[in-house]
């Protein structure tokens, strides 16, 4: 029956005591409105068997009168001994011969209508098990996916469930029941299964004894239509599906219409009439016998008050029932009875309410759900768990170390079982505080520990409460202490005589424990202990200090609390105290601070605050007020030791000492601190946060900034004011020599003398007649001497001695006299010299006749520098058969040639392919000779930051120059592409390397003429090389410039003098170097953006220069401005620039600001990029890996020429190789005369020793003979980006064919004082 509405709210909770081991009991719940109408809790033991209690007696006590079971109904292990105990307890008589016979039947389940979980019948020696009113098995909890599990019941003949209508969830397994004839053969399971397509039925070996002569011995009553649970007329199976009309899935037979009619849609398992009140069970929810869609909410909206109010008719949702209260073993979350709180919620076991609370980020403990036995895998997931939502069953063999993950567990919601373990204590549960017992082991135990023979002590020091369930501690033969523990303060459930529900037996004998001195510590009181240590006491006899019982408290760091009898710790910084606060210290551990905010009360701190400093006695004293909150090391106001660590405001004295100041603002620092002859400096000073005062110039009384200028620096002169011109006024200690004192100024103002006066002498006034001495000439007008720039026409001559203008030439007269005297002397010497020469000639002529006749006259040689050494560099001539030019891979183009990607196949290195760049010239014969000269120039130059040339190919279709291929391309594109990954370190490094290469060219007397980032190639992320020597020229030993008046060149990099003089020098290269550095700093931006080529010259003539980049410091920009001085002689040389950028490289962040977040370069990524670029450029024809193989390769082929020389007369040029400090090159990189294999052969790839890389390198031989594997990089220089009409060049010639030029068109390149010639890229 269902609850009548009138009594649905007066459920009684009847406690049930199930006996175990005689005197022990545990509490389950059973709520009844009458003895025949109860709600009961189920079990979850499955087919496991624990203990030896009276199972039949427990089943009767638990389930007699139950109408609904929340959980599983488990009828298991009812064997002969259980039946015997049942008969003895009920005084049932039986023939002694049939003592072991099975029970015929039991009637414990006569009132049962619903099972929320599963029905399990296992090894039950009962001939007939009847459930006369069971209608629904919901299967909310299934056993191995089964809602009905009947297994190994040898003596069971019938399981009768004649009212069963539906099994909502889970399958059916009926196995090894040989005498169960009806349920195995006479039941239509399609009528019972809610979803036959999903739910399965297994009936193996369950009716093999039910056949005789091939016919079933199970006979249904004739009214049952051959479908029944037993042989009686009341055992027929109820049919409510197969007989229904097609329009409905469940129906009932209507007597009024004598037909089957459809049930309400809210019904489950059929119905007895129309409407939701007559359902057998409910499809969704049931409220007081009526099937409904949802349970009424416990809070409803009150339209009058506009808020939620309590609903007196509201219910909790428990399964598919709407109830007034949730069962005690369940929690409550959002008006639903739940077994576990959902994610983001937790249940506080220390409170009396069972509501799931929403977690706060700082308060929610880590909750771990455990449903089954512990395994090695589940243990790993319990790391750091504070609550176990479930149970802990420790049955398998675990090591003590594995179980240490449970040390953080404080609460277990169900139970703990520990069986047959070999550890000595349970310290892995040392923080366990509460066992709730919301579900119990074997329906009774919250804590069960048995058969652990090595267990000596429990060590559950933190256990304070077991809310529900009993404690079982048995057969632990070495376990002491447990019998002395006061369990009444821990176990809430009470048994007989109102004693704790406890079963302790067959552990270590108490007297034997005393003999072994395994007893509680003397500081424990009579409540007992968990072990023998003083921290194992349940309660201390006297004092408790940090969890340990002691006789008395420690005097250091502790305070005695007479109320709680605890030794409480002082504040961590207190050594002794009279209270627990930070201000209750008597003495301190570290530093002592007298806090003025608390009446100068003593406070102990670990370190002094920033406004104080520690004395030798560890007392914190206040810093000087001028230190503000910047910290100090002493009481003074100076910056440094004994004073402030930093100054907010400061004054800097002449001896560079700095003292901190106070001020109301940075603009008033000097005035408020009485420093009239000081000014507020705008420069940063180390240790000063905002600003500081610096002393004015010694010539100024007061000033506003550094300097002596009256107007600009507002300098008030202390001595005199000097006016070199009307717009400039400077304070000085005394007037300079070339000045005069202005009258009526009290000797305080002096002006500069007239410009015709000699500036090394004083003057009387500012007129040309007031000079003490004239600079040029003097004209006397009476007694007045006037200084003039040149003599007047009436006095055309001057006296060289004093510059006086005369009307006669006094110098001519003196010259004539001197010439006569000198002529006479020279004539005498000439006659004597001729006589001596004649005698000498005669002697020489006679001596020659005596020499050997075969002596050949040597031609007269032009004198040269004796230190000049011959150029012994070797030139590699490469046959065209060893080159493959990839015409479809164009890397760049110039006015007279094009650069293609190609492959070099050395003749003597079999199966070797080297990626190269090939520059093909298409010019006439004269230009070819000039290109050959320039290529030879490139070949002899060797430096780390200059691109190396491999060799030449002289073919009919033009001269080809072969160089190393660099996949990373030119620096201009590289800066733009990798801007986000480059910083100050890389930018300054590139400038330094370019300066190093240009310094080498300067020493070799080579003018580059086209230095720019587009003509700088990237070898590696930290290594660049200067290229494009097509414009370079070598200076003769007696010339310092070359003049080019035609050709093509990019004007944005031209020095200002080239526009007018067409003259290239090292100084013009310095100008281009400055522009190149500007490009690097701006990550490849084009200079003079938005300006036409014609306006750049006027822009520079007006004194303008490229602007300071935002990431560039003043010091670095100042170096660029020096490179752009209008006077070439004022520009620094590359030797100076090399040293300056070398200094910049030491601390690049001081000169360039990192505008990007820079990460460390990934060398493997760089190599992969170069490898992919080579594969892409050469269509996979080159395998980069082959260059690291160990295989032997032949030497390079011998050149047709044994030696190539590049003769340059005089100068440092002959010492070309001595200027290279690096050991990466050798003078003769090709061994032309050798055919044997050598380890250091040029361009022979070697096996990479430490780490194999898949990047293709072009090998280059160093000076010391070692082979360098140079990684090749990307796009080449001279790559056209825009049409020629907007290329940024002027005087640009059209590309000519191989048609010979006229003499007027071809001007020769000349040095100074020689005829000017044409060059490919000239102005």
Swiss-Prot record:
- In this chain the Protein kinase domain maps to 885-1152
Glycan attachment sites: 91, 169, 255, 376, 561, 655, 746, 776
Annotated InterPro entries: Furin-like_Cys-rich_dom, Furin_repeat, GF_recep_IV, Growth_fac_rcpt_cys_sf, Kinase-like_dom_sf, Prot_kinase_dom, Protein_kinase_ATP_BS, Rcpt_L-dom
- Topological domains annotated Cytoplasmic: 840-1323
Q: Which cysteines are joined by disulfide bonds?
A: 220-228, 224-236, 244-251, 248-262, 263-271, 267-279, 282-291, 295-322, 326-337, 341-356, 359-364, 520-529, 524-537, 540-549, 553-567, 570-577, 574-585, 588-604, 608-620, 623-632, 627-644, 647-660, 670-693, 696-703, 700-715, 717-731, 735-750, 753-763, 757-771, 774-787, 791-805
Q: What is its main location?
A: membrane
UniProt topological domain (Extracellular) ranges? 21-818
Q: What is this protein called?
A: Receptor tyrosine-protein kinase let-23
User: What's any GO biological process attached to this entry?
Assistant: regulation of DNA-templated transcription
Signal sequence annotation? 1-20
Comp. bias intervals (Basic and acidic residues): 1293-1302
One Pfam family from the record: PK_Tyr_Ser-Thr
Give UniProt keywords alphabetically: ATP-binding, Cell membrane, Developmental protein, Disulfide bond, Glycoprotein, Kinase, Membrane, Nucleotide-binding, Phosphoprotein, Receptor, Signal, Transferase, Transmembrane, Transmembrane helix, Tyrosine-protein kinase
Which stretches are transmembrane? Answer: 819-839
Changing residue 368 to Y does what?
Answer: In sy10; severe larval lethality, lack of vulva induction, infertile and lack of male spicule formation
Keyword Cell cycle in annotation: no
Task of the protein: Tyrosine-protein kinase receptor which, upon binding ligand lin-3, activates 2 signaling cascades: the let-60/Ras and MAP kinase signaling pathway and the let-60-independent phospholipase C-mediated Ca(2+) signaling pathway. Each pathway regulates distinct functions. By activating let-60/Ras, regulates larval development, induction of vulva cell precursors during vulva development, male spicule formation and posterior development of the epidermis.
Q: Which residues form the active site?
A: 1010
Q: Where in the cell is it found?
A: Apical cell membrane; Basolateral cell membrane
Family recorded in the similarity comment? Belongs to the protein kinase superfamily. Tyr protein kinase family. EGF receptor subfamily.
Mark out the compositionally biased spans (Acidic residues): 1303-1315
Topological category with respect to the lipid bilayer:
Single-pass type I membrane protein
Q: In which tissues is it expressed?
A: Expressed in vulval precursor cells (at protein level). Expressed in ALA neurons, 2 ventral head neurons, a single neuron in the tail, pharyngeal-intestinal valve and posterior arcade epithelial cells.
Q: What is the lineage of its organism?
A: Eukaryota, Metazoa, Ecdysozoa, Nematoda, Chromadorea
